C-alpha cells in the first residue's frame, strides 16, 4: 500500500472517533463558525455601494468613502484637506 493509501485509511479509521458527542461539539462549532464567516464575507463582497446615501446598511462607494450626517440624513462625502 502506498503512503497516501495508508494516510487515507488511517483518516477513515479516525473519523468515527471524532464525533460531536465525543469532542463536546468543538468540531461542529468550528464548522458552523467557518460557514457563518464565509456567508458574512460574501454578503460584504456582493453588497453594492451607494454613491449618495449610507443609511439602512448601505455602504459608501470608494469615490465618496465617508458617511456623514447632513440634517438628519446620512450621506456619503469625500473629505479633502
Swiss-Prot record:
GO terms for molecular function: ion channel inhibitor activity; toxin activity. Keywords: Disulfide bond, Knottin, Secreted, Signal, Toxin. Disulfide bonds join 49-61, 54-67, 60-76. Residues 1-20 form the signal peptide. It holds the Pfam family Conotoxin. GO terms for cellular component: extracellular region. The presence of a 'disulfide through disulfide knot' structurally defines this protein as a knottin. The cysteine framework is VI/VII (C-C-CC-C-C). Belongs to the conotoxin M superfamily. This is Conotoxin Im6.1.
Amino acid at each position: 500500500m502506498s503512503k497516501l493509501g495508508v494516510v487515507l485509511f488511517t483518516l477513515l479509521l479516525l473519523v468515527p472517533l471524532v464525533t460531536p458527542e465525543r469532542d463536546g461539539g468543538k468540531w461542529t462549532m468550528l464548522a458552523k463558525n467557518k460557514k457563518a464567516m464565509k456567508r458574512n464575507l460574501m454578503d460584504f463582497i456582493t453588497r453594492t455601494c451607494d454613491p449618495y446615501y449610507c443609511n439602512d446598511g448601505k455602504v459608501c462607494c470608494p469615490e465618496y468613502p465617508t458617511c456623514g450626517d447632513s440634517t438628519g440624513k446620512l450621506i456619503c462625502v469625500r473629505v479633502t484637506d
